[in-house]
Regions:
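N-terminal acidic leader/helix
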Residues: 1-30, 56-63
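Short, charged, amphipathic alpha-helical segments
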Residues: 10-14, 37-49
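Alpha-helical transition-metal enzyme core signature, strongest for iron centers
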Residues: 20, 47-52
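Charged, low-complexity interaction regions
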Residues: 29-39
């Protein structure tokens, strides 16, 4: 994979990471100061694990 392809892939990973961040923020804002319910907590855990996977992919892509 050349550097241009890596850059495109990295950009795609960043966009996906940002989208997941937005989804997490939306869930937290739904609670609006109230404790998150179990479904919300599980959903956030799932989204956070997806974010971690994207970070692993980005690091692997950059050879870290």
């Amino acid at each position: 994979m050349n550097n241009e392809e890596k850059a495109r892939m990295y950009h795609t990973l960043l966009l996906r990471h940002d989208k997941l961040d937005g989804q997490i923020s939306d869930i937290k804002s739904e609670a609006a100061g109230v404790e998150l319910n179990n479904d919300q907590k599980k959903q956030i855990e799932l989204l956070e694990s997806q974010k971690q996977e994207l970070v692993r992919q980005a690091m692997s892509l950059m050879g870290v």
